[in-house]
């Protein structure tokens, strides 16, 4: 690789790493969770954007180079709206915009095709859906599954956002990630508060 290409890659990695640490705080630390549901949803949205940024999907998951990342929030429209706001502020990730859709937990099975065609599904408690139902629905797909409790990864989910007092961090299930045919950056997995084998 020519020196200028290496320099560009290093600068890009440095910028992405800086952005990651600005969102997550220092390595090994969680991000302070602002008070209020909307603020917490924005922090969760920042995590979701960065999970997309640091995850590799099989190339076949995209019909074209312009196809957006599709994030589905199983939960309230308020949570989906906050995630949508953060995604818009983040701008394109790897040249793709992020489209955020909301699915009500009552209609989970009817929305099966939308969920299975997405890249990331965030199961928020406000959706009233059991972790097991969502995970079973997404079996055999290349969809990054993220929940909002540690029980989500114990049930077979890939990542879960967890609050510890005023801070938000995450836990990971590397086995479920590999089983889903995805690769989450090892640097990200090292930042997880816990990993479930």
What is each PLM-predicted segment?
Residues 2-197:
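Short hydrophobic alpha-helices and adjacent helix-cap/hinge residues
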């Amino acid at each position: 690789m020519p020196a200028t290409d290496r320099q560009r890659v290093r600068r890009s990695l440095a910028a992405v790493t800086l952005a990651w640490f600005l969102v997550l705080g220092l390595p090994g630390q969680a991000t302070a969770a602002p008070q209020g549901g909307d603020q917490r949803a924005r922090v969760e949205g920042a995590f979701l954007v960065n999970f997309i940024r640091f995850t590799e999907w099989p190339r076949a998951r995209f019909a074209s180079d312009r196809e957006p990342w599709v994030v589905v929030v199983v939960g309230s429209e308020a949570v989906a709206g906050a995630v949508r706001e953060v995604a818009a502020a983040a701008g394109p990730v790897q040249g793709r915009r992020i489209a955020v859709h909301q699915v009500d937990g009552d209609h989970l099975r009817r929305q099966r095709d939308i969920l299975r065609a997405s890249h990331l599904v965030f199961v928020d408690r406000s959706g009233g859906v059991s972790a097991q139902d969502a995970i079973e629905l997404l079996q055999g797909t290349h969809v990054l599954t993220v929940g909002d409790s540690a029980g989500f990864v114990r049930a077979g989910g890939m990542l879960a956002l967890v609050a510890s007092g005023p801070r938000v961090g995450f836990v990971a299930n590397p086995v479920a990630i590999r089983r889903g045919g995805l690769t989450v950056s090892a640097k990200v997995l090292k930042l997880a508060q816990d990993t479930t084998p």
